[in-house]
Structure formats: C-alpha cells, structure tokens
Amino acid sequence: MELKDYYAIMGVKPTDDLKTIKTAYRRLARKYHPDVSKEPDAEARFKEVAEAWEVLSDEQRRAEYDQMWQHRNDPQFNRQFHHGDGQSFNAEDFDDIFSSIFGQHARQSRQRPATRGHDIEIEVAVFLEETLTEHKRTISYNLPVYNAFGMIEQEIPKTLNVKIPAGVGNGQRIRLKGQGTPGENGGPNGDLWLVIHIAPHPLFDIVGQDLEIVVPVSPWEAALGTKVTVPTLKESILLTIPPGSQAGQRLRVKGKGLVSKKQTGDLYAVLKIVMPPKPDENTAALWQQLADAQSSFDPRKDWGKA
C-alpha cells in the first residue's frame, strides 16, 4: 500500500504545528470543495486533503505516521517495521499498521459503501402577495464541510437562484435535489430543503385558503348601508355594506383569497363598528333623538338565554 506524503499534500512542513496545519486544511478544503471548485479533479483532491487531515490532526496517528515515513526507504521496511513500543510487524501486517493510524480507512476505502450527503434546511420568508404567482428568489446559505470524523470543520457560503412556485403555504417544503452536502465514496449529494414561512401581513389573517380583513365602519354606515374601498392582495375593490349590518358580520368576496393548485380561497371582510369621539352638545342631542325613536329596541333582550 502506498504511503502518501501528507505534509506535501497539505503544503506544510513536518515541523509545523497543528494550528498551521489546520489553517492549510481549511484553505485547501475550501479550494477543492466539489461545490466550489471547477477543477476536474477537485473531488479527488478534496478527499485526499481530508485523508491527510484525518491523520495529521491526531497527535498519536501523526507520530505513528512520522515514524513510518522516516523508514519508508529503509530496506528493512519491506520486511519488518518496529513500532514505537518495540513491537515488531511483518510485511504482511503492513495493512494493520495503516489501519491503526487511519482507523481502517486505508484498508476499507475500497469496500466502504457509497454514502449519501447530508440534507440542509433553510427557512425562506415569503410575503402574501408573492404567493399569487411564481417568482424568482436569490437565496444564500452555508454549506457544511465535514471532516473525517463526521464533525463540521467549516462552512462555505453558497448562493442559488431559485423559483418559488405560486400557491406556496406556510410550512411547505420545497426540495432542491443535490444542493446539500457532497456524498462520500461516490454517493449522491444531499438535498436542500426550503421551508416556506409566510410573513405576517398588517391587514390580512390567513384561515386555511381564505383571508380575513377587518373593515372599520361607522354606526350610520352599518345602519344605512354604504360602499367602502377594501384592499385585496391584487387590487382594491368596492365592497357593499348592506343596511342593518352588525359588528363582527362577515361579508364574503369570492376568489380573493389564497391561490393553490387545487383551489382559490375567498376573502372575508369582518365588520368592526367604530364609534366617533366623545360627542359635542349637538351630536349628543342627535344621538338622544335616535334613542328616543328606537326606545322599544332592547339589544340585551335575549342576553343570557339559551
């Protein structure tokens, strides 16, 4: 089995400390990461750098490797290698020596199964108005780089231009195949999942596929009826308030709710009767006239009755 020059692979000296080697590893891992580098051998170089870091980052493995490297050209090396504790290893045990250093990576590298990369989830905020039509979005996220021990060593920024389809809902997940972390040993990349978060709207509340909006009206508008301008997600409409409308009454506007592949929801205007400020003497007199004219009306007549 070939004994690679890990120091040369990392571009460092055997006398360099761990901090220097770690800096070199991060630089090379970023340079040869398959999702960043355009070089044809980037994936192979990336794995080679990761293999070197796996050994040189561990004090015991590095010491064993250094001893092996020192005796690599010794004729006795092919027949017998002396471990630091005096134990002898024959040439047929050479693979076992590698296994003790590499955690059996060297022996099993050809036998290890292909492993799929990790999935990544990021939250994407979408405004209600944007749900009506397909739109493009530029998203940025950090792509984790895992070392040989399965720990995140660093994160590489990545940017994608994606399409957000019409009709997305809160909590919906959109899959971008292969945009997660790279697989190992020829395994496929993981996926990127966009988790949709519908941003709160200052006017509209979401109720399933429907929208609700509170429409303030005056007492006389509710009593006599009127037309008021009401906003929707697309444009404003003229809403008819029928005479005798009540506070909390819901007026349906068909087809002005949320859009999905299966259906389009409705908009419900919820009436809120707003009293004017404290009346002056003339206004109070008018209210009194109204009260006298409606003296037989008792709004609490059925109050508390089943």
Swiss-Prot record:
UniProt subcellular location: Cytoplasm, Nucleoid
Lineage: superkingdom: Bacteria
Gene3D superfamilies: DnaJ domain (1.10.287.110), Single helix bin (1.20.5.460), Urease metallochaperone UreE, N-terminal domain (2.60.260.20)
GO process annotations (BP): chaperone cofactor-dependent protein refolding; protein refolding
Segments passing through the bilayer: none
Protein purpose: DNA-binding protein that preferentially recognizes a curved DNA sequence. It is probably a functional analog of DnaJ; displays overlapping activities with DnaJ, but functions under different conditions, probably acting as a molecular chaperone in an adaptive response to environmental stresses other than heat shock. Lacks autonomous chaperone activity; binds native substrates and targets them for recognition by DnaK. Its activity is inhibited by the binding of CbpM.
Name of this protein: Curved DNA-binding protein
Underlying gene: cbpA
